[in-house]
């Protein structure tokens, strides 16, 4: 039996039959279909190292505050969006205003938005 034929046969199984097949294969070969937890831990380590060396940041608007109009003006200036798009972004907070910007640029954007009265996060 070719692999393609086997795949076609397995594809035709009902969910109950497929679950029974998985269980039978687990018992026959002494394995588990559950994902290995070790892989998750190993993947977390590079992510932690990357966080230490982060060079690109996302500026996230969490709330417009009391000066919504001023925040919309600043968002328009930063993003180049039209009035409606900038208003929708501000109304839809929390939303990313700028993504993957340098730390220096991100800090400038955060300062501008905070000066306008917005609540902002740097991620």
UniProtKB/Swiss-Prot annotation:
- List the molecular function annotations (GO) for this entry: mRNA binding; structural constituent of ribosome
**Could you say which protein family the record assigns here?**
Belongs to the bacterial ribosomal protein bL12 family.
What organism is this sequence from? Chlorobium phaeovibrioides (strain DSM 265 / 1930)
Per its database record, what is this protein's job?
Forms part of the ribosomal stalk which helps the ribosome interact with GTP-bound translation factors. Is thus essential for accurate translation.
| Record-linked InterPro entries | Ribosomal_bL12, Ribosomal_bL12_C, Ribosomal_bL12_C/ClpS-like, Ribosomal_bL12_oligo, Ribosomal_bL12_oligo_N_sf
Query: Which keywords describe this protein according to UniProt?
Result: Ribonucleoprotein, Ribosomal protein
Output the Pfam families linked to this UniProt entry: Ribosomal_L12 (PF00542), Ribosomal_L12_N (PF16320)
This chain belongs to which protein, by name?
Large ribosomal subunit protein bL12
Q: Do the record's keywords include Aminoacyl-tRNA synthetase? A: no
Name the gene behind this protein. Answer: rplL
| One Gene Ontology term, aspect cellular component | ribonucleoprotein complex
Methyltransferase among keywords: no
Its domain of life reads Bacteria
Q: Name one GO biological process term.
A: translation
Q: What quaternary arrangement does the UniProt entry report?
A: Homodimer. Part of the ribosomal stalk of the 50S ribosomal subunit. Forms a multimeric L10(L12)X complex, where L10 forms an elongated spine to which 2 to 4 L12 dimers bind in a sequential fashion. Binds GTP-bound translation factors.
